[in-house]
């Protein structure tokens, strides 16, 4: 699963996920992409599950790019622990997603195969997505 090798600080404040994606909002590497139209978080497990769904469907064909990286630690306190006594330990990592962000890209497969692979991947993600193709001349 994806997670940072090292971090300057173990824990991070919650913050707010606002605005739309101004970077990473177009297909840059492949021919087809899976773009999120919702705002939210993708955990490392969700990204990996979607990647596996794509890989299994296209079999040996094509090349896949993961355009997001889960670099934000989410901390939780254990069950049945009273409030206070400091912040909990980092449990998992998430990628903050704004509307318009391209999450996956693929090249080397026909459009119909890419559409079906991304449909299977989208079922693993908690956000609404749409299929996008590379713009010619962009």
From Swiss-Prot:
CDD domains: Ribosomal_L16_L10e. One of its GO terms (cellular component) is cytosolic large ribosomal subunit. Keywords: Ribonucleoprotein, Ribosomal protein, RNA-binding, rRNA-binding, tRNA-binding. SUPFAM superfamilies: Ribosomal protein L16p/L10e. HAMAP family: Ribosomal_uL16. Binds 23S rRNA and is also seen to make contacts with the A and possibly P site tRNAs. This is Large ribosomal subunit protein uL16. It comes from Acidovorax ebreus (strain TPSY).
């Amino acid at each position: 699963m994806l997670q940072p090798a090292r971090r300057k600080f173990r824990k991070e404040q919650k913050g707010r996920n606002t605005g739309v994606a101004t970077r990473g909002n177009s297909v840059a590497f492949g021919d087809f992409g899976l773009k999120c139209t919702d705002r939210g978080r993708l955990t490392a497990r969700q990204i990996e599950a979607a990647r596996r769904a794509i890989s299994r469907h296209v079999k040996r064909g094509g090349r896949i790019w993961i355009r997001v990286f889960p670099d934000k630690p989410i901390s939780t306190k254990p069950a049945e622990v009273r409030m206070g006594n400091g912040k909990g330990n980092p449990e998992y990592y998430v990628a903050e997603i704004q509307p318009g962000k391209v999450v996956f890209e693929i090249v080397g497969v026909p459009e119909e195969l890419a559409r079906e692979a991304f449909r299977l991947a989208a079922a693993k993600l908690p956000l609404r997505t749409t299929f996008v193709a590379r713009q010619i001349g962009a």
